[in-house]
């Protein structure tokens, strides 16, 4: 009996010790995570840095922040969310003027999961909803006075839960719920059938090109088809209106099949924007949004689809490199989005380059046919009125290298409206270009504006664009930008396709009569009055006009990314040919499934290559921790120019350890007591900040209508206002720095982070990101534009080798960032997870050259959130210009040990340079506002850190005690058992 009791105690202590160890591990893990997220925890608790912004709001007379001004602000913020949708919703289709709805058309039925459970935004880092205020399509319809069929709503509420909505599943309800009394209810609510179609993807997950059912995720799934068929077969609905709740350009070639009357693209409207879209439906607002991506009939018809996703390296007998198992190659070159569809269209019309071959066709019944391949062009959008455009004149100022287009817009309808003026150009495609593999898009966006035009009135607007946008990058001949000789055609139109038709009419005249078509296949004539011609003054290709940077004339612009081209690394039998309009049929991309890792490529994939330079300075050559006669505090540097010598004195006060404090981000930057610099919080993201307000009801920060909507407004003022309102959010949340906006290019409609980027076009993103960043700066917020660059997919994002040629890099992918970073509006940039070629972006010297030299960028550089990994070498990153390590406080410690152990003055100089940028940037934020001089920083740890450390000690002690007790009881059990056996042996 005693033995059983003893064993029972041992087992109990075994269970208790196991539980204690588990709890201790959980507590330790929680502590680690909390310390990694220190800035966000401090922000949530109102500790250290909670007062790091010092006013500047426009919602109080003197700029001070208060509960009262917050109430004014939050009302305006939600109104602006609705304005985003009012100006950014795109009317794609409107058969027989089905929209706007009359006041008598108010008895409606909603269909589709998105009507009651829309995709408000992606789930990437960003704002959370405030449920009491969010608006679904049903909410917005009811608020607007519509009588929504309750029987159908009840049917959805009681139906079996649909399949989870994901990147590979639409997650639509089973249409079997529409039976009996449910379908009987249609007659009473038959004015309009509203169908909301939604698609979802997010950070870390691209939309599945083909799902488990073998369908493209951007075509209608079977349940959606059944819904439309049910509506059509019922015969009860006067109109069918689609709300397209998808930032991903869906396939829309089925509208006639299901008798759809109208389609309104609403994108991801954020939590509060949907009422703005419904005002477009009712006609309270005249639609003025235009597409930011091409809607193809088959979403895999773009040449980028041939090389999207993961493609595996073949290492053979070599040991694979860390995070180096996959690659993607942009074999389409510059022919991204509309630049492909429109260029192939022109060449088909003119019989050039075998453009009408079947190669690359996905929706055409015979040879390549524009009207069968494209549903809605880039830049396209309908209105409830009609506009006529005249390009009155075109002026060129050679001193500023600026073209000014004067455009008159006439509203020939009976409704007031906002007209979007889109200015495009066609540049010559010459023999020189063909010989040197310089590609030319048939039409390219140059600039835009938006103006109010009353019914029956005309307005004139000027659009200024840099002449530099007409240059093409020649990576093979001139190894720089070139300006071809010949005629340049400028045109305006409702999207790229109409503008191109206008150019072709002006350029070719009778030769294209009867050949020009719109996206529906209707023959059009083109509007030559919307075209102006400029003849370049050079009679042969000019390779010198743009030889030096327009932002830093001392720097020559020449090839920087030769090693980003897959052909730089590939064996001869694996080299690729980039898509060329000179031969569509023989250069159309095929999938590069694998790439042999030869010795050159293997060495290139190794990121652990840093070696201290032989001529590196010694740490002793630097003055650190200097006690000045008069201490210079953080606030004393307010207003001090970046190149002022005072910075040397200020930074000399800091020790190496103090310099490294700024360089480890923990969702914020810690305080530095030595110079009385407060800590601050840094937050994500492009769709809204993942923080809470410090005033009023302390609700979550605003979840805006997302960046594709901002881009689709085609309105500089609205885009700037988005940045300002985002900045106001930051003021009321005491946040000086945010990781936003996103500016990567939508190379594929399947890109997982589409909701965080503006457009498929680098120029539209150039202007939009510039405007948003400018608006943020107006409010004391440092926007951090991301992810720089070639980060167009989520698959394999950490370490994937991204290959592209330099023309595409410069004209498409870098240009999207150029407006915000080179024009001086943004002082923050985040590099990407991927490799540029084989070199990790944050360790790529080419990126530093572009930013610091060519673009004369004066802000800070941060890597994307990547903890210690062999492909992200801390010293390599630092030497390549990375100033702060995102969500990584271990890297600065690594740097400190390396500097002190190797006496590496080069690394130390980079640490000092990084602090120069970081302190300067923080002072340009709301941290440098009035009141900063009153800040006194304590070096005491926040209370929650002390508490967590105490809990760590307590639970670890309990775990140790439990283990000790288990060991003791186990030993006692064994000893007792031995004694029992001995006694038994003696009895025998």
What do these predicted regions represent?
Residues 467-542:
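Terminal connector regions
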Residues 1-472, 482-492, 496, 545-988:
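Glycoside hydrolase catalytic-domain context in secreted enzymes
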């Amino acid at each position: 009996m005693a033995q059983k009791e003893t064993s029972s105690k041992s087992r109990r202590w075994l269970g208790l010790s196991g539980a204690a160890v588990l709890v201790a591990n959980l507590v330790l893990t929680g502590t680690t995570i909390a310390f990694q997220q220190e800035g966000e925890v401090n922000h949530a608790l109102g500790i250290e840095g909670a007062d790091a912004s010092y006013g500047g709001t426009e919602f109080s007379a003197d700029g001070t922040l208060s509960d009262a001004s917050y109430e004014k602000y939050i009302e305006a913020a939600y109104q602006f969310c609705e304005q985003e949708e009012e100006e950014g919703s795109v009317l794609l289709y409107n058969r027989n003027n089905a929209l706007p709805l009359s006041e008598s058309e108010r008895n409606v039925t909603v269909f589709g999961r998105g009507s009651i459970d829309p995709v408000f935004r992606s789930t990437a880092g960003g704002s959370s909803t405030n449920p009491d205020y969010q608006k679904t399509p049903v909410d917005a319809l009811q608020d607007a006075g519509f009588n929504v069929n309750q029987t159908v709503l009840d049917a959805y509420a009681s139906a079996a839960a649909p399949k989870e909505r994901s990147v590979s599943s639409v997650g639509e309800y089973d249409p079997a719920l529409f039976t009996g009394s449910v379908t009987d209810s249609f007659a009473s609510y038959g004015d309009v059938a509203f169908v909301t179609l939604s698609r979802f993807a997010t950070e870390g997950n691209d939309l599945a090109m083909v799902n488990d059912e073998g369908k493209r995720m951007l075509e209608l799934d079977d349940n959606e088809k059944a819904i439309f068929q049910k509506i059509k077969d019922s015969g009860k609905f006067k109109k069918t209106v689609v709300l397209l709740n998808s930032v991903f350009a869906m396939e829309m070639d089925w509208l006639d099949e299901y008798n759809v009357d109208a389609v309104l693209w609403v994108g991801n409207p954020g939590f509060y924007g949907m009422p703005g879209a419904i005002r477009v439906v009712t006609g309270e607002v005249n639609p003025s949004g235009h597409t930011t991506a091409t809607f193809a009939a088959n979403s895999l018809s773009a040449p980028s689809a041939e090389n999207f996703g993961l493609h595996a390296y073949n290492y053979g007998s070599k040991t694979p490199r860390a995070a180096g198992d996959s690659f993607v190659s942009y074999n389409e070159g510059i022919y991204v989005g509309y630049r492909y569809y429109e260029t192939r269209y022109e060449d088909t019309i003119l019989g050039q380059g075998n453009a009408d071959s079947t190669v690359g066709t996905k929706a055409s019944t015979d040879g390549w046919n524009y009207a069968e391949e494209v549903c809605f062009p880039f830049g396209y959008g309908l209105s409830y009125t009609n506009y006529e455009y005249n390009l009155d004149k075109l002026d060129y100022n050679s001193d500023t290298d600026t073209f000014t287009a004067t455009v008159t817009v006439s509203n020939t309808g009976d409704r007031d409206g906002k007209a979007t003026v889109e200015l495009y150009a066609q540049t010559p495609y010459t023999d020189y270009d063909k010989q040197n593999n310089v590609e030319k898009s048939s039409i390219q966006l140059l600039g835009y504006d938006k103006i109010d035009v009353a019914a029956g009135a005309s307005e004139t607007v000027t659009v200024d664009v840099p002449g530099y946008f007409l240059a093409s990058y020649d990576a093979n001949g001139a190894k720089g930008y070139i300006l071809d000789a010949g005629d340049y055609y400028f045109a305006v139109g409702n999207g790229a396709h109409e503008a191109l038709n206008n150019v072709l009419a002006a350029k070719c005249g009778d030769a294209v009569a009867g050949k020009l078509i719109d996206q529906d296949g209707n023959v059009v004539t083109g509007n030559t009055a919307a075209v102006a011609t400029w003849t370049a003054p050079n009679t042969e290709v000019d390779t010198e006009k743009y030889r030096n940077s327009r932002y830093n004339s001392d720097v020559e612009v020449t090839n920087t990314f030769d090693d980003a081209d897959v052909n730089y690394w590939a064996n001869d039998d694996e080299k690729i040919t980039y898509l060329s309009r000179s031969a569509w049929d023989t250069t159309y991309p095929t999938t590069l499934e694998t790439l042999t890792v030869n010795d050159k490529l293997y060495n290139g994939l190794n990121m652990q290559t840093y070696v201290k330079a032989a001529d590196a300075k010694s740490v002793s050559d630097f003055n650190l921790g200097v006690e000045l006669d008069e201490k210079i505090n953080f606030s004393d540097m307010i207003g001090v120019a970046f190149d002022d010598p005072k910075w040397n004195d200020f930074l000399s006060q800091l020790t190496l350890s103090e310099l490294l404090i700024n360089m480890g981000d923990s969702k914020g930057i810690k305080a530095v007591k030595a110079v009385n610099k407060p800590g601050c919080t840094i937050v994500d993201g492009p769709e809204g900040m993942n923080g809470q307000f410090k005033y009023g009801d302390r609700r979550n920060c605003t979840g805006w209508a997302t960046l594709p909507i901002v881009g689709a407004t085609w309105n500089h003022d609205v885009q700037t206002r988005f940045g300002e309102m985002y900045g106001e959010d930051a003021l009321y949340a005491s946040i000086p720095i945010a990781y936003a906006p996103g500016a990567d290019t939508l190379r594929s409609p399947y890109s997982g982070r589409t909701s965080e980027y503006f457009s498929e076009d680098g120029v539209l993103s150039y202007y939009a990101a510039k405007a948003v960043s400018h608006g943020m700066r107006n409010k004391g917020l440092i926007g951090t534009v991301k992810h720089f660059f070639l980060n167009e997919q989520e698959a394999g994002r950490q370490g994937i080798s991204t290959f592209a040629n330099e023309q595409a890099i410069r004209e498409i992918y870098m240009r999207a960032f150029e407006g915000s970073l080179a024009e001086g509006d943004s002082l923050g940039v985040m590099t990407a997870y991927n490799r540029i070629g084989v070199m990790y972006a944050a360790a790529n010297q080419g990126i530093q050259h572009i930013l610091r030299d060519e673009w004369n960028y004066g802000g800070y550089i941060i890597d994307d959130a990547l903890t210690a990994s062999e492909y992200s070498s801390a010293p390599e990153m630092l030497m390549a210009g990375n100033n702060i390590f995102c969500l990584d406080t271990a890297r600065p410690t690594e740097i400190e040990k390396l500097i002190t152990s190797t006496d590496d003055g080069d690394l130390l100089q980079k640490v000092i340079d990084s602090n120069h940028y970081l302190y300067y940037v923080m002072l340009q934020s709301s941290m440098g506002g009035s009141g900063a001089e009153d800040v006194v920083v304590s070096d005491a740890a926040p209370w929650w850190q002390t508490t967590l450390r105490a809990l760590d000690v307590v639970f670890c002690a309990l775990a140790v005690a439990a283990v000790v007790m288990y060991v003791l009881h186990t030993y006692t059990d064994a000893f007792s058992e031995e004694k029992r056996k001995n006694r038994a042996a003696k009895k025998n």
